[in-house]
From Swiss-Prot:
PANTHER family: UBIQUITIN. The keyword Coiled coil does not apply. It comes from the Eukaryota. One of its GO terms (molecular function) is structural constituent of ribosome. Pfam families: Ribosomal_L40e (PF01020), ubiquitin (PF00240). In the N-terminal section; belongs to the ubiquitin family. Coiled coil: none annotated. GO terms for biological process: translation. Keywords: Cytoplasm, Isopeptide bond, Nucleus, Ribonucleoprotein, Ribosomal protein, Ubl conjugation. InterPro entries: Ribosomal_eL40_dom (IPR001975), Ribosomal_eL40_sf (IPR038587), Ribosomal_zn-bd (IPR011332), Ubiquitin-like_dom (IPR000626), Ubiquitin-like_domsf (IPR029071), Ubiquitin_dom (IPR019956), Ubiquitin_ubiquitin-like (IPR050158). This is Ubiquitin-ribosomal protein eL40 fusion protein.
Length: 128
């Protein structure tokens, strides 16, 4: 039987499958056509994410059904070098108390004309 897989870019892929095919087999066929690794694929049908190890017939997927393909988002811990870089560019700043302009740590006066280049500066508050 033929099913369709719609990607986020709007393209539709036609796949030739059997009702007894597992979700892993479908993901492997998508990898053959699109080059997306199976571990990054998430298949959605009838507002449900399809679990690996189950078959198409388990989800009542019939001929000419459309599955939706979305990519898995990977999260994790930031590397220490990226944290240091974020601190340098976002946290280690001074702020003008009058116009709230962000300034470098070594600044003594504000760079904005709106507050008259005042010297009333404070360190930017840390995130909690």
């Amino acid at each position: 039987m033929q099913i369709f897989v719609k990607t986020l870019t709007g393209t539709t892929i036609a796949l030739e499958v059997e009702p007894s095919d597992t979700i892993e087999n479908v993901k492997a066929k998508i990898q053959d056509k699109e080059g997306i690794p199976p571990d990054q694929q998430r298949l959605i049908f009838a507002d449900k994410q399809l679990e690996e190890g189950r078959t198409l017939s388990d989800y009542n997927i019939q001929k000419e059904s459309t599955l939706h393909l979305v990519l898995r988002l990977r999260g994790g811990v930031m590397e220490p070098t990226l944290v240091a870089l974020a601190k340098k560019y976002n946290w280690e700043k001074k702020v003008c108390r009058r116009c709230y302009a962000r300034l470098p740590v070594r600044a003594t006066n504000c760079r904005k004309k709106a507050c008259g280049h005042c010297s009333n500066l404070r360190m930017k508050k840390k995130l909690r």
